[in-house]
Curated annotation (Swiss-Prot):
It comes from Fructilactobacillus sanfranciscensis. This is Unknown protein 2 from 2D-PAGE. On the 2D-gel the determined MW of this unknown protein is: 15 kDa.
Length: 7
């Protein structure tokens, strides 16, 4: 799985 977080 991949989790991408961009603020």
């Amino acid at each position: 799985v991949t989790l991408d977080v961009e603020d």
